[in-house]
Amino acid sequence: MSRQKVYLALSADILHHGHINIFNKASELGDVIVGLLTDEAIAEHKRLPFLEFDQRKVIVENIKGVVEVIEQNTWSYRENLYRLKPDFVVHGDDWKSGYQERYRNEAATILSEWGGKVVDIPYTKDVNSSDISKAINQIGTTSSFRLKSLRSCLLYTSDA
């Protein structure tokens, strides 16, 4: 008997433990196929990714439970859903509102055509990629932050 097909789409530019939770929950439902957003798709709603598509693909291909990684060229799941006809689409429940809500609704409507379901995983509240991205940018670009870090390093080394 073949396992059920689970589709999960993401950018995977900055992965954190909340994403791993989603991968784990998805793999409990069946074979996980990841629709990896292209650089162009990410740039539609966010910034350009830190890592290029091929780099992100290698990372995701090596996550436990992932059986395949394919391109997702837009934020809409439509094209890949009709091609794959998965039993489930798994996503963090943060897409129930905001700019992603329309993509969730579209996915649910398409999945209903063959009895598929959207599975919303409770969002990991203590971490998100946007905050991590901001912190990375602050570390790399804010001179006052760099000076403060340097001062801390100098104080630490002078105490040693």
Task: Please place each PLM-identified region on the residue numbering.
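Classical nucleotidyltransferase
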Residues: 2, 73-155
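N-terminal catalytic cores of NTP/NDP-binding nucleotidyl/phosphoryl-transfer enzymes
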Residues: 2-36
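Short glycine-rich anion-binding loops that position phosphate/pyrophosphate groups of nucleotides
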Residues: 11-13, 39, 94-96
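Divalent metal-coordination and catalytic microenvironments
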Residues: 16, 32, 60, 90, ...
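Short acidic amphipathic segments
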Residues: 29, 57-75
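Residue-level detector of structured alpha->beta connecting loops
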Residues: 30-31, 64, 85, 115
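A short acidic, helix-capping loop that chelates divalent metal ions and anchors anionic groups
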Residues: 40-45
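Conserved small/polar residues in nucleotide/adenosyl-binding loops
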Residues: 156-160
